């Protein structure tokens, strides 16, 4: 895998390289990573870059985004992750296939024990990874329902023998099972002054030195705040929506 496989994000060469290296190792042995940072710092953009790189080098990408309104729905997050490969559940032992279908309301009967569902999820990913490396990319893990967080953590701690990569982004200050699992971490800090100026030039064009200094000081290296502080960001609804969606 070449370092150039990932698109460039301003001021994020170190983080992109770390993700690229992780995916490179993941084609041979499982890897897991927690991406941690403040709102607007760029976690979602980094996951997007990881997704592009993973697909470019042959991974099957399974992605999900935690949604606060679904945090009380058991296994909603896990369903997001596994839905594209649920047909492969037919390759599992019947007890595991039934466990997953029951968890997702696709089969009658009581919901199985969480441990059984977690084992079934691992076996399903292993079956898929036997044909093609798998990258599980989850944004806003802190908003996943508790059951899905625990299963995701279970998966991440059992990837080593298989071509499975698990990367989850967590907002700073939101403890949970995934963050507490002791997995390797990538802490995303604010961008430096040079990158901050480049972001401003990209979003706002030419600014007066005093305006540039003010925005840079107020943003404190946060890319979303940096972009939001530019006049062009506020004047362009398309720019505003796009930036808020892609940079967290």
Residue positions per predicted region:
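Key residue(s) within conserved catalytic/signature motifs
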Residues: 1-248
């Amino acid at each position: 895998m070449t370092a150039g496989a990932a698109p460039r994000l301003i001021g994020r060469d170190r983080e992109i390289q770390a993700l690229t290296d992780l995916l490179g190792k993941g084609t041979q042995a499982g890897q897991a990573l927690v991406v941690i940072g403040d709102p607007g710092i760029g976690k979602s953009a980094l996951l997007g870059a990881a997704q592009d790189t993973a697909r470019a080098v042959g991974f099957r990408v399974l992605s999900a985004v935690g949604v606060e309104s679904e945090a009380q729905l058991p296994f909603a997050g896990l369903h997001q992750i596994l839905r594209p490969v649920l047909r492969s559940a037919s390759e599992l032992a019947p007890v595991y296939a039934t466990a997953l279908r029951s968890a997702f309301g696709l089969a009658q009967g009581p919901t199985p024990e969480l441990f059984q569902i977690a084992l079934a999820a691992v076996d399903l990913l292993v079956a898929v990874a036997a044909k093609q490396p798998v990258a599980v990319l989850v944004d806003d893990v802190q908003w996943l329902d508790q059951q899905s967080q625990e299963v995701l953590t279970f998966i991440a701690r059992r990837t080593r023998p298989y071509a499975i990569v698990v990367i989850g982004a967590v907002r700073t200050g939101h403890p949970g099972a995934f963050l507490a699992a002791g997995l390797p971490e990538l802490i995303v800090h604010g961008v430096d002054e040079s990158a901050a100026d480049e972001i401003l030039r990209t979003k706002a064009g030419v600014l007066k030195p005093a305006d540039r200094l003010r925005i840079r000081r107020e943003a404190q290296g946060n890319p979303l705040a940096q972009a939001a502080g530019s006049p062009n960001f506020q004047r362009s609804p398309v720019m505003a929506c796009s930036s808020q969606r892609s940079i967290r």
